[in-house]
């Protein structure tokens, strides 16, 4: 206990050494000086307090608009919005997940992709890529560049499924319904060929498999 308490006091002392500043002033000064400013968001669009799958959301703004409210930066000063998405979908905790894989394949993706909460260690739910939700995220955030990650996790699968639309109340829709009721929502999939190559060390798009 004494050792843990000593470590705690050491950590507090380190925090007290850090300089305090009005970050909005620093940001404005950097902007006026023509410096490049990079803001990184945490959590996904579907957890946003306003545009997420309420009530299964977080308590803050997780969209690109959060850069404005969090930094004190005016919306018209944002240049590029880079959207980052996984080659498959994940979610922690409760909430709608139309493409969820609650089976051995889902567990395989979880283990290979190390899909566990960074703080709590809770297993993340996994599923096929949902292009309907991705399209929604692109529109809400005003994404100008889109980057995919973790495609290497899916190496070795004979085929992949990608959700391109939903069947909702007897109709096929290509947008997120107002109410994401799992009982009423059925994903429509398109099958794509998989690949066997190991993509771990790939750095160029020309080295990716033809799929």
Regions flagged by a language model, labelled:
Residues 1-211:
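Non-transmembrane, aqueous-exposed alpha-helical and coiled segments at domain scale
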């Amino acid at each position: 206990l004494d050792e843990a308490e000593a470590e705690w006091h050491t950590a507090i002392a380190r925090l007290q050494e850090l300089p305090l500043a009005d970050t909005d002033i620093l940001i404005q000064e950097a902007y006026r000086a023509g410096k490049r400013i990079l803001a990184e968001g945490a959590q996904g669009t579907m957890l946003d307090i306003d545009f997420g799958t309420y009530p299964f959301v977080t308590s803050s703004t997780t969209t690109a608009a959060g850069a404005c409210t969090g930094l004190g930066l005016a919306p018209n000063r944002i240049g590029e919005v880079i959207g980052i998405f996984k080659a498959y979908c994940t979610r922690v905790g409760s909430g709608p997940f139309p493409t969820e894989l609650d089976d051995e394949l889902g567990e395989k993706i979880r283990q290979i992709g190390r899909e566990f909460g960074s703080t709590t260690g809770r297993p993340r739910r996994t599923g096929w890529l949902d292009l309907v939700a991705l399209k929604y995220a692109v529109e809400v955030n005003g994404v100008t560049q889109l980057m995919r990650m973790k495609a290497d996790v899916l190496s070795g699968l004979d085929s992949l499924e990608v959700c391109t639309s939903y069947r909702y109340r007897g109709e096929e829709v290509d947008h997120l319904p107002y109410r994401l009721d799992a009982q009423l929502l059925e994903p429509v999939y398109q099958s794509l060929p998989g690949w066997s190559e190991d993509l771990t060390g790939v750095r160029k798009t020309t080295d990716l498999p033809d799929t």
